[in-house]
């Protein structure tokens, strides 16, 4: 084995075990490669570091020099070959080392020869200026109503909808349609009573006991502050009886597709800084992107990856949930981001990386969130292939439009809408898409900033709707839109355990942009 090959093997084993070499340590390994096996020294370093109570992510030169002396002494007293000795020493700590194959042929990434095609369609960063006054909130909901009303009136069956004021003046038994924002929802046995308002007036709408099961189902799925169209019959009592509920919806469409066979990796919720961060799995993921992990089929998938889209929660943050500090490997958020940057820097430079914040990141918690400050991502400032955008944002990659959203409001959907579950996040995402709004409910777990323009209204229908937050992998196709929740890289925390939720870890959806087919690549 040549010196460069021995050095590469040592570096791979370091990364797989979840550690990093600093510059001096790498230089030391390069120097000794001609006379010693660097992998043997790294094996001892991993064994020693794994036994320490105080964990560290970096291997320094002083440690390697000390361990080299042990290796030299050991070699004098044993006839075992260095490679064999290394395997015996390190396999218990690094079980995945044997799965990292050099492959039968050199990795030649197809995507490296393809020119990037990425355009930012929508990003709220730099456009946020609310003062949080009552007037701001009134303006915000008026804008939401107007934008969603416009989407509803694009439907043939809603174009002629009347204002609530006109509906109140209508004679009894008249059938008509109104557009309104739901301000109250009360359920009594088989009855649902809705309070609905537009910009001028308000009305009470009843979903009666004898309504069809389909209508009752639609009523159960309604959320507060959602803008919908209601087909009603005016009653003599002043109430209006619901005949149908119409969401803004998305029409059946043919999605855009790339003209070349390139792929996008969709991931999120890395949570560096957490003791539950799946470090080894994420290392395998980075190795895979570099063509250094997996079988030939996995490497073939990796060779076509041109984009990596990360939908928030890059770090675990500080003070996000009760007793979080007990599960932090570092309480310094700057260190958390530096560790995340170390990983992202190892993604090949021909791959374009898009990062948005989540509720654990160093950005304001209210939606929309501006991009993560450069002060935290300082190490990536010079990286020409890394784009730090706001949450949500829309990007076009090779002609395919992707709506990226961290997914905080999925908590509200799951907790308030019957039939929704953390185990099937794609169903909650589909409901948001049907509602044409990323966070309809105000006053729940999701904080909303009253901007003059409600950028959470889904005005452009994407080809791919990508979210995270829930830590559960799920995907489906709905009317030409690929809906994907990308799971995460954090094992079950005490907070998750409290709710009986088991996350999906280390499974990455990869979208072929030429066909929009989704392949899930496992790293756990």
Cite the ranges covered by each PLM segment.
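Extended recognition/assembly regions associated with phosphoester-bond processing machinery
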Residues: 1-524
